[in-house]
Amino acid sequence: MGRWQAGARERLEQAALALFLERGFGATTVPEIAARAGLTTRTFFRHFADKREVLFAGEADLPALAARLVADAPAALGPIAVIAHGLDAVAAVVGAGRIEDLRVRRAVIDADAGLRERELQKFAALADAAARAFRARGVDPLRASLAAALAVTAFRVAVARWLDEAGARGLAEVVAEVLGALQSVVADTPMPAPLPLPA
């Protein structure tokens, strides 16, 4: 009877990231990942459905998290303030301890069209979940969709900037900078009446 090896998941993740970076995602096989980690292919499949899941594991829960962050924001906050509240909460829990893994992950995804598509699908799911949560707060559908798209974009820009800086500043500080820039671009005011169309 086999026994579970301590740290197997982390070893598989590290081996996969190293191989993806060395050889490219498409040229790396599951048996190679398992061998690099000193484990069996069977052990790999106990932890991951396929090699893509090394990069995307746990992300199925992100839309629910996005919706909860919007729903849990104080009721008095407008959409831009809700975005700030949610991104501050995320920044508080994303630590710099795995920044190098996140940088490698980004490089691997950027180098593969299929992975980039998967990443875009993830962001679309986040925006959809956030838009539904904004509508549930009573935000009209157009503003809800825009707020959700802005939230996802602000998150993407902040994380990219943080990774580009190799974690020289904390993510919370970068988020604050991005939110300041966002507020300088978009005024947090009620939507004006649409202009009449020319006859």
Annotate each PLM feature.
Residues 1-23, 27-39, 65, 173:
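Basic, helix-initiating cap at the start of DNA-binding domains
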Residues 23-25, 38, 45-57:
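HTH DNA-binding helix-turn interface
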Residues 64-107:
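Hydrophobic alpha-helical connector segments
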Residues 119:
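Small/polar (Gly/Ser/Thr/Ala-rich) solvent-exposed segments
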Residues 123-148:
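Hydrophobic alpha-helical bundle segments that form small-molecule/ligand-binding pockets
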Residues 132-135, 167-199:
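C-terminal peripheral helix-coil segments that are non-catalytic and often amphipathic
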Residues 148-168, 184-191:
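Amphipathic C-terminal alpha-helical segment
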